[in-house]
Amino acid sequence: MTATLERRESASLWARFCTWITMNENRLYIGWFGVVMIPTLLTATSVFIIACFAAPPVDIDGIREPVAGSLLYGNNIISGAIIPSSAAIGIHFYPIWEAASLDEWLYNGGPYQLIVLHFLLGVCCYIGREWEFSYRLGMRPWISVAFTAPVVAASAVFLVYPIGQGSFSDGMPLGISGTFNFMLVFQAEHNILMHPLHQLGVAGVFGGSLFSAMHGSLVTSSLIRETTENESANNGYKFGQEEETYNIVAAHGYFGRLIFQYASFNNSRSLHFFLGLWPVVGIWFTSMSVSTMAFNLNGFNFNQSVVDSQGRVINTWADILNRANLGMEVMHERNAHNFPLDLASNESLPLALVAPAING
């Protein structure tokens, strides 16, 4: 009997890299989307941290009055922010090599574009990575679908809204007080509180919080005890066990009697699908509202729409909201606008009807 020994061909470096990238047994799954996700998110995070501490003031309004947002320039954690790119740049792509110098790039708010664009690309790849990992494990794709909600919300305020308004200077600043400033100005300019898509989004977020609290409390209140009275109920379960840990029939019966029968689910799959669907669809609606208002399809305006038989205005909540909007409009960008257009919308009064005669 003759035995033939052949040298096993070693896999190429590329083949080993492909195997390692797509291996399910890694402590952290990388995947092909992760190849793009990791460097983009690391870049966005690194530039964000550096800019938070040391970025120089940015001429956000394009009127040569720079606004400081970093900690080294007198801000704290609450007031600090990454200031959006200058209105002088508009929606032009503004990488470092487009500026004459690094100082000019910083003065015009280049770090904001760098952070936002890398961040959005990174989180989109995170969606793809979730789908890829689920596919390789034989799971269904709903985890990646659910994560589209925060991604489209971020895309709406960081990308779609600036494009619709014509400048990255209208994007949301990357900071706590900057976020609140963005919300107030958005309300003043677009009346978002009266936009039906935003109202659906509020119902989705608050409803999702309510349903999550209700579900969690019902589950923890109807655990199937596997231990004695002298031992914690938490000790009777194993991670990944096949047996149910709580009695859904008991939870369904309790909640059905607490409200009414059809207000509760008796099917675990439909229950959890609803819990995932409600907030995700709500955030989708909110993102759509911001995206439509980016192109000035604003919220409803019912100002002075209720009058009595004499034609006198009966002030409603819409009129109060309008006055608040005007106040916020006056306060923001006070150096860029001498007189808000909203307050100058009435008919102009003639100051001189006839030119004076000059007798020389």
Curated annotation (Swiss-Prot):
InterPro entries membership: D1/D2, Photo_II_D1/D2_sf, Photo_RC_L/M, Photo_RC_L/M_CS, PSII_D1
Positions annotated to bind [CaMn4O5] cluster: D170, E189, H332, E333, D342, A344
Specify the superkingdom.
Eukaryota
After translation, the protein is modified as follows:
Tyr-161 forms a radical intermediate that is referred to as redox-active TyrZ, YZ or Y-Z.
**Which residues participate in Fe cation binding?**
H215, H272
Chief subcellular location: plastid
The record's cofactor note says: The D1/D2 heterodimer binds P680, chlorophylls that are the primary electron donor of PSII, and subsequent electron acceptors. It shares a non-heme iron and each subunit binds pheophytin, quinone, additional chlorophylls, carotenoids and lipids. D1 provides most of the ligands for the Mn4-Ca-O5 cluster of the oxygen-evolving complex (OEC). There is also a Cl(-1) ion associated with D1 and D2, which is required for oxygen evolution. The PSII complex binds additional chlorophylls, carotenoids and specific lipids.
Binding-site residues for pheophytin a, renumbered to this chain: Y126
Question: What binding partners and quaternary form does the record give?
Answer: PSII is composed of 1 copy each of membrane proteins PsbA, PsbB, PsbC, PsbD, PsbE, PsbF, PsbH, PsbI, PsbJ, PsbK, PsbL, PsbM, PsbT, PsbX, PsbY, PsbZ, Psb30/Ycf12, at least 3 peripheral proteins of the oxygen-evolving complex and a large number of cofactors. It forms dimeric complexes.
Record-stated family: Belongs to the reaction center PufL/M/PsbA/D family.
- Which HAMAP family does this entry report, sorted A to Z? PSII_PsbA_D1 (MF_01379)
> How is this protein named in the record?
Photosystem II protein D1
The scientific name of the source species is Antithamnion sp. (Red alga)
